Amino acid sequence: FFGDFGNISSAAAITGNPK
């Protein structure tokens, strides 16, 4: 996924974080 955190990249995408 395209996450800026890497660790919670997938989680961020689910929460609505396009980082």
UniProtKB/Swiss-Prot annotation:
Q: Which GO terms describe its molecular function?
A: metal ion binding; oxygen carrier activity
List the cysteine pairs that form cystine.
none
Tell me the first and last residues of the signal peptide: none
Q: Which domain of life is it from?
A: Eukaryota
Keywords in alphabetical order, please.
Heme, Iron, Metal-binding, Oxygen transport, Transport
Report TM segments: none
- Where does tissue-level expression of this protein occur? Red blood cells.
What is the similarity comment for this entry?
Belongs to the globin family.
Summary of the function given for this chain in its UniProt record: Involved in oxygen transport from the lung to the various peripheral tissues.
Q: How is this protein organized at the quaternary level?
A: Heterotetramer of two alpha chains and two beta chains.
Protein name (database record): Hemoglobin subunit beta-2
Source organism per UniProt? Saara hardwickii
